[in-house]
Amino acid sequence: MRHRSCFSLFAGLALVFCLAVGTAAAGPVQVDIYGPGQGSLNLAMAAPLGPTPGTPVSGMGVKLNGFINENLSFLPFLRLVDQRAILGGTVMQGYKSPDIDLKRFQLAGADLVVTAGWPQGDASGSFVELRVYEALSGKLVFGKAYSHVEDGLLPNVADRFCSDLMKALTGRGEFFKSTLAFVKHDGKNKRDVWLVKPVGRDLRKITNLPGEALSPSWSPDGRFVVFSHFDDRSHALGVWDRLTRQVQRIRFPGNTVIGPCFLPDNKVAVSLSSGRNPDIFLLNHLFKKERELEANPSINVSPSFDATGTKMAFTSSRMGGPQVFMKDMTTGQVTRISKTGSYNTEPSISPDGTLVAFTKMTDTGHRIFVYDMVTQSERQVSFGPGRDEQPSFAPDSYFLAFTSNRNGAQQIFLVTRHGGDPKRVPTGPGDASFARWGMIPE
């Protein structure tokens, strides 16, 4: 029954009111999240209404608005308008034009207004209509109906709606569809891989092996998570299969398995040592060694690929201390991209191939920097306190996850490619680290 409800919810979004309404003279409100001067918008939430005009609902409707508010607090380009600032309150006569009074929201400084209508009431199994209006012009940005809504599915409805809203405003909506794989400390010499939504929901443990898991990586198809694993006896490649919920541990000759990373074709790059120093190897779809990707007398670790698989960022000690390099997988050319500092590690290339985030040791500690491949310049995007490390670009090439102990314990934080105020991802008790983004198919 629950499976059918989920299918109805996401496959049956039959009622689409409008998408990106606009004219040649005045298009819909949009935000450029990639340009240097990122703008922001003020957004207000109207009270959810039932079938009787001017009468708010008090059950699932209130909960859904709460989940939406919680989600939108993670978007730095949206500022939520305090309901107390709206003269006349947030309860309107209707939830769609012309029965909505946008003037009160406009006076409170809102650029956008979200309305929620429950034509059959908000009992389990009903449907909700969600719309977004421009406060000034009254234009509809978009609207959708979500059917067969149940209490347990409300977070999913909020995620889907917020993804649609972000896509309408920015052109990208992957953030709310993403899932982070990360490592959580669970006692002495015990670390396992966990999953969590970037807003902190759906927290769950997926491995339970003796020893320590490190550096998880999602496959592009959302089926596998690979990770480094070591116990008292050996190092190995761990593989979790989402379809079977099984974990296997794969050994290789040598004693080191470091930083596995999926390529766009679902093959894996990983650092293995068969001699003195580790080199980067390609594994096939059966996780068997296929060929070398980068070999050098020095240490070569931490591969990271763009969405095309033609660019590989990695860390190497070939110039003495660890530095970040870029390899053109078509020509084989290798270029150093960490221009300053004596200790630069843990690169993460953005899927669009334009940026590389990495950890730099500075005079004030380890910090996250972003190198721009176009302008060939770098900028600092995290500022502590404590130790900031292990950056990871999201599928939208906008958000970055990283690990920090600024509050004492290791925790996961989100920031954007531009920097800004970090937002902590709730992961429960225990140290959390090595966050990596993935997309699970709906």
Curated annotation (Swiss-Prot):
Residues 1-26 form the signal peptide. Gene3D superfamilies: TolB, C-terminal domain, TolB, N-terminal domain. Transmembrane segments: none annotated. It comes from the Bacteria. Keywords: Cell cycle, Cell division, Periplasm, Signal. GO terms for biological process: cell division; protein import. It is found in: Periplasm. InterPro entries: 6-blade_b-propeller_TolB-like (IPR011042), PD40 (IPR011659), Tol-Pal_TolB (IPR014167). One of its GO terms (cellular component) is periplasmic space. Its main location: periplasm. Part of the Tol-Pal system, which plays a role in outer membrane invagination during cell division and is important for maintaining outer membrane integrity. The Tol-Pal system is composed of five core proteins: the inner membrane proteins TolA, TolQ and TolR, the periplasmic protein TolB and the outer membrane protein Pal. They form a network linking the inner and outer membranes and the peptidoglycan layer. Belongs to the TolB family. This is Tol-Pal system protein TolB. It comes from Nitratidesulfovibrio vulgaris (strain ATCC 29579 / DSM 644 / CCUG 34227 / NCIMB 8303 / VKM B-1760 / Hildenborough) (Desulfovibrio vulgaris).
